[in-house]
Amino acid sequence: MQLGMSSTKMKSLLKGLRYISQVFAIEGEKEEEMQIGNPTDVKHVAHIGWDGPSDNATAPSWMNDFKSSPVMESIQGLGEDDSSVKCQSEFGGRTRDLPKLPKSTRKSSSEKGSPTKERSDKTKRRTSNKGTSSSRRTKDEDSTSSSRRTTKDEDSSLSQHSAGLPEVPKKSKRKKSKEAGNGGSSRSSRISEADYMSDTGSDRSMPQFEDDRNGF
C-alpha cells in the first residue's frame, strides 16, 4: 500500500514538471518564431522599396509604378530639402533662427515669473512714497517757519524805526485860531486908520483904533 501511494505521488509530481516544461518550451518556440534575424535587420512595411536599387528585386511591382509617378519624385525632392534644413538647424541654426526678444519684454517676463521681485518692487514703491511725503512735509514746515521769521523780523525792524524817530510836538489848533484872529483884527485896524487919515488929511488916528492899541 505504501509503495502504491508513493508511486502515485511521484507520477503526479512528474506530470506537473512535464506540464511546466512544456509551457516554457512553447513560449520559447513562439519567441523564436517572432524573432526574424537580428533586431537591427527588422524593417517596417512602409519602408519597403525606399532604401535604393538593391531592394528592387524584393519590392513588389506596384511599388515600381508608384515610384515612377512625378508626384513621388517631387515629394522625394522636398524630403531631401527638408532633411538638409533639419541638419542645419540641429548643428548651427538654432540660435540664428530664434527671434531676438527686446530687453523690455525679457525683463517683464522675468519679473512676472518671480513673485519675490514683485514684492521687492512693492516695498520700493512704498518707501519712495514715504520719502516723498516726508520731504514734502519738511518743505512745508521750512516755508512756514521762514514766513514766520520774516514777519517777526519786519515787526522788530518797524519797532526799532519808530523808536529811533523823535516825537513830533503836537500844536493846539486853538492857539493858531487865536493868533489868526488877532492878526486879522490888527490888519483891519491898520487899513481903516490909513483910510481915515487919507480922507481927513490929518495925522491923528481914530479914537477907536487908539483904544484898541491901548488895549493890546
Curated annotation (Swiss-Prot):
Keywords: Cell membrane, Cytoplasm, Growth regulation, Membrane, Nucleus
PROSITE patterns membership: CRIB
Primary localization: nucleus
Presence of the UniProt keyword Cell membrane in the record: yes
UniProt note on tissues of expression: Expressed in roots, leaves, guard cells, stems, flowers, siliques and pollen.
Gene3D superfamilies: CRIB domain
Cell compartment(s), UniProt: Nucleus; Cytoplasm; Cell membrane
GO CC list: cytoplasm; nucleus; plasma membrane
InterPro entries: CRIB_dom (IPR000095), CRIB_dom_sf (IPR036936)
Region spans: Disordered: 52-216
One GO-annotated biological process of the protein: response to light stimulus
Membrane topology per record: Peripheral membrane protein
CRIB domain boundaries: 36-49
Biased composition (Basic and acidic residues): 108-121
Alphabetized CDD domains for the sequence: CRIB
Keyword Ribonucleoprotein: no
Further remark: Over-expression of RIC7 in tobacco germinating pollen reduces pollen tube elongation.
Function: Functions as a downstream effector of Rho-related GTP binding proteins of the 'Rho of Plants' (ROPs) family. Participates in the propagation of ROP GTPase signals in specific cellular responses. Functions as a downstream effector of active ARAC4/ROP2 GTPase which is involved in the prevention of excessive stomatal opening upon light stimulation. Is involved in pollen tube growth regulation through its interaction with ARAC11/ROP1.
Assembly and oligomerization: Interacts with ARAC4/ROP2 and ARAC11/ROP1.
Protein name: CRIB domain-containing protein RIC7
Source species taxonomy: Eukaryota, Viridiplantae, Streptophyta, Embryophyta, Tracheophyta
